[in-house]
Amino acid sequence: MRDLQDIRELINPEGITDGKIVAAQARFYDYCKMINPKFYRDDRPYQRDLCETLQAIFEGRLINKDTGEPYKNLMINLPPRHGKSYTLTLFVQWCMGKKNDTRVISVSYNDILAGRFARNVRDGIDADKIDSKVTIFHDVFPTTRVKQGDAAAQLWSLEGQFFNYLATGFGGTITGIGCSMGIIDDPIKNDQEAFNDHVLDEQWSWYTDTFLSRIEEGGMQIIVMTRWSTKDLCGRLLESEDCCTAT
């Protein structure tokens, strides 16, 4: 005969307790550890710093000491292979679970990467429970779902919303749509682009003329990239704007 604890483990073998769910809903870093505990580990302190910084700007807790107002612009610079893009996809999932009217425009250096980023966000939200030992988005946010029939990889909505997500490459068309969160994810493809003044000038022009016009009043922008050049997007912003930076 099995005791009560054995029965609980059979019902809930992965150990997803109410306390863990509440923690994952409240703290983005806890959400990441629930979704992928093998990658998000306490012996990688930069991951906690990244997650807590992203959550802080989303919640308006990064305060400009000079103005007393929350920062709205965040740039984070990390080397390759540190999980920047992956963490951003989980962050968008978490934000939409917390607030399902979050509207995101994400930009990568080309449409292929932009589509992959958007698909990872969408599929993470829409994942079905196949393995009882694997935690999925709906374990944490059971009422947030992608609207069926409106789930193209690069443009989709959540149930009850008109628009939640648009992904494009640098130079793409984003007219007619505004966002509460604009994300730029590694806009530089390689070192050849990083030191090509024409490419950098085109990116800057598209950023200032097109991307910024899509950020709604009170919206935030997040730029996460590996630094290549003092003339890249982050370099120009550091010269021209007051940003909150984490490196």
Provide a role label for each language-model segment.
Residues 1-82, 86-247:
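Short, flexible loop motifs at catalytic/binding sites
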